[in-house]
């Protein structure tokens, strides 16, 4: 049976948050697209720090300029504005801000606030309607997710020689003038992704290694000089089915109460199916376990089953529900919340 037009559109939207960005200018080799979304959302939970309105707006632009037939300049900026705060509160944050150059088959090089190399793997399981992707990927946590001071080189199809083999090389400069858990020393990262020449199956791997700061080594937990991580992932995306799994390990990197975990073992898996009429149910599992932590030994940092669904009215409008079934023990020695959360809401995106 032929897929409906709606199903094809939805699969495109899921594949890229900005796939249907609005083109506002395209002339003489210069192009500018804008994109964004309004997520009107409410959390229901016994955890008072989570329960309540979670509405926010995201907005961004992507631009490029054709310098010559080989060289293209580009830039991207994205911000988020909280919709659940008083007007007097400062609630804006910059998610992405980078610019760079792309030289045809030789790849692209950019600098700024960007996604870390480890997230090239972790993104495959960060697909739940609301939750997910939080075992090892955290904002401003070395190169696990969005971070500042990143110089990033990306190459697709390995210089045009191997279809489907993509490579990332990344360097992160020192960031110290912030909370110790958000700091980082100089570091590097790399990732490889291969889809076997355009098949529906792909594998990926990533590695990062960074210096830790003096302030981080003064914290009670994890005093190693280096923060290190590796990750590997598998993905299948075809026939309306999406399946992905990720395993990673971090050392002296994952934040916990009192500092960082000496070691964390992280696992995520997600399964989704796209119905022709717009419904996309989702089932997943996320776990992060801290190992050999000072004073407490091994303890779960994140552990939950996720059951959710998104209904796409069209490419711009959707409604969702996401149930985070927490598996953390009530007597968790790190004080991690053990309460369930249900997220319900609607999203308008362009």
Swiss-Prot record:
GO cellular component terms, semicolon-separated: cell outer membrane; pore complex
Highest taxon in the source lineage: Bacteria
Record field: transmembrane: none
Induction note: By phosphate starvation.
The keyword Transport belongs to this UniProt entry's keyword annotation: yes
Gene Ontology biological-process entries: monoatomic ion transmembrane transport
Position of the signal peptide: 1-21
SUPFAM superfamilies, sorted: Porins
Pfam families per the UniProt record, alphabetical: Porin_1
Any one GO MF annotation of this record: porin activity
Keywords: Cell outer membrane, Ion transport, Membrane, Porin, Signal, Stress response, Transmembrane, Transmembrane beta strand, Transport
Keyword Transport: yes
Subcellular location: Cell outer membrane
Membrane-protein topology: Multi-pass membrane protein
UniProt cross-references to InterPro entries, sorted A to Z: Gram-neg_bact_OMP, Gram_neg_porin_domain, Porin_dom_sf, Porin_gammaproteobac, Porin_Gram-ve, Porin_Gram-ve_CS
Function, as annotated: Uptake of inorganic phosphate, phosphorylated compounds, and some other negatively charged solutes.
Subunit structure of this chain's protein: Homotrimer.
PANTHER family xrefs: OUTER MEMBRANE PORIN PHOE (PTHR34501:SF5), PROTEIN YDDL-RELATED (PTHR34501)
Protein family per UniProt: Belongs to the Gram-negative porin family.
Name of protein: Outer membrane porin PhoE
């Amino acid at each position: 049976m032929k897929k409906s037009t709606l199903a094809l559109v939805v699969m495109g939207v899921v594949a890229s948050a900005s796939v249907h960005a609005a083109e506002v200018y395209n002339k003489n080799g210069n192009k500018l697209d804008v994109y964004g979304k309004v997520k009107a959302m409410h959390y229901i939970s016994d955890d008072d720090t989570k329960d309540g309105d979670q509405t926010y707006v995201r907005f961004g632009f992507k631009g490029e300029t054709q310098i010559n037939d080989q060289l293209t300049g580009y830039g991207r900026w994205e911000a988020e504005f909280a919709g659940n705060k008083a007007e007097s509160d400062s609630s804006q944050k910059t998610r992405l801000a980078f610019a760079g150059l792309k030289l045809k088959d030789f790849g692209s090089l950019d600098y700024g606030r960007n996604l870390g190399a480890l997230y090239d793997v972790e993104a495959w399981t960060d697909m739940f309607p609301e939750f997910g992707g939080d075992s090892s990927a955290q904002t401003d946590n070395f190169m696990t997710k969005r971070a500042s001071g990143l110089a990033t080189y990306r190459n697709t199809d390995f210089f045009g020689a191997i279809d489907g083999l993509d490579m990332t090389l990344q360097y992160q400069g020192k960031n110290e003038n912030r909370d110790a858990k958000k700091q980082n020393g100089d570091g590097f990262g790399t990732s490889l992704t291969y889809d076997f020449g355009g098949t529906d199956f792909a594998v990926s791997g990533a590695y990062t290694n960074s210096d830790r700061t003096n302030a981080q080594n003064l914290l009670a937990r994890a005093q190693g000089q280096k923060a290190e991580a590796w990750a590997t992932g598998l993905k299948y995306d075809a026939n309306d089915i999406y399946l992905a799994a990720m395993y990673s390990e971090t050392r002296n990197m994952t934040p916990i109460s009192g500092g960082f975990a000496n070691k964390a073992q992280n696992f995520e898996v997600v399964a989704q199916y796209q119905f022709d009429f717009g419904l996309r149910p989702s089932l997943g599992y996320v776990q992060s376990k801290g190992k050999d932590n000072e004073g407490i030994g091994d303890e779960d940092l994140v552990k939950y089953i996720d059951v959710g669904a998104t209904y796409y009215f069209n490419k711009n409008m959707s409604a969702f529900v996401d149930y985070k079934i927490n598996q953390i023990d009530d007597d968790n020695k790190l004080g991690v919340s053990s309460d369930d959360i249900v997220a319900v809401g609607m999203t308008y995106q362009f």
